[in-house]
């Protein structure tokens, strides 16, 4: 039964990754200035349904943050900021994700891009990486945390070893937040807050 549940979670996680991504691209064709409200509503609805399904089958764990979890969120977020500052002091980070971000912002910021980067993408990534992979499949083990963080880094398409370790550190911190809290909203809020920081430079 345990193996069936893990296969079920793995299949569902892949399905969410494929469907949500394909739905978003089919709406705007990669142009965040097109069909903005439709893009936001459809992706939000798909993620909402995904969370409901996963919660129904006990694949993920989330709820209102306790005081301890709130402190964990604040501490993890501050640590990610410090790691980011320290890492960029010694290394340059280059990746496909970073290049895509620069290309999207070169023509200005659209509402759908802002919502995608700061809300939808963090929710989707935390749902798949921390909720499904680390939690449901690897049962929140330390090995699962490390493997999931490595996959998280790889899928951000780093161009070199320092860039790989940059995203790996981020994945490890997010994974640690979920492992210690057993609440997916903790790592998701950290991810949202961190992704919001670069956009402040455009204000």
Predicted segments — roles?
Residues 1-15, 40-41, 56-86, 137-143:
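Interfacial transmembrane-helix boundary/kink motif in multi-pass membrane proteins
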Residues 5-55:
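Alpha-helical transmembrane segments in multi-pass membrane proteins
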Residues 8-12, 40-41, 70-74, 111-115, ...:
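Hydrophobic alpha-helical transmembrane segments
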Residues 21-24, 146, 161-203:
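Functionally important transmembrane alpha-helices
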Residues 32, 58-121:
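Juxtamembrane helix-loop-helix connectors linking adjacent transmembrane helices
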Residues 51-60, 177-180:
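Structural signal for the C-terminal ends of transmembrane alpha-helices
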Residues 123-128, 132-133, 154, 158, ...:
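Active-site His/Glu-centered metal-binding helix of metallohydrolases
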Residues 124-147, 176-183:
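Membrane-interface helix/loop boundary segments of multi-pass membrane proteins
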């Amino acid at each position: 039964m345990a193996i069936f549940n893990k296969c079920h979670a793995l299949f569902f996680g892949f399905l969410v990754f494929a469907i949500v991504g394909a739905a978003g691209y089919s709406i705007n064709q990669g142009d965040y200035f097109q069909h903005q409200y439709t893009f936001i509503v459809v992706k939000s609805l798909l993620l909402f349904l995904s969370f409901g399904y996963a919660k129904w089958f006990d694949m993920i764990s989330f709820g209102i943050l306790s005081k301890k979890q709130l402190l964990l969120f604040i501490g993890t977020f501050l640590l990610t900021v410090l790691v980011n500052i320290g890492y960029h002091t010694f290394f340059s980070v280059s990746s496909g994700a970073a290049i895509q971000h620069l290309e999207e912002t070169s023509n200005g910021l659209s509402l759908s891009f802002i919502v995608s980067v700061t809300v939808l993408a963090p929710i989707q990534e935390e749902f798949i990486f921390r909720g499904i992979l680390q939690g449901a499949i690897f049962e929140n083990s330390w090995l699962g945390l490390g493997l999931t963080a490595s996959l998280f880094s790889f899928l951000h398409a780093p161009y070199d070893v320092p860039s790989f370790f940059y995203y790996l550190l981020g994945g490890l911190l997010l994974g640690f937040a979920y492992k210690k809290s057993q609440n997916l909203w903790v790592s998701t809020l950290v991810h949202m807050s961190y992704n919001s920081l670069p956009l402040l430079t455009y204000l």
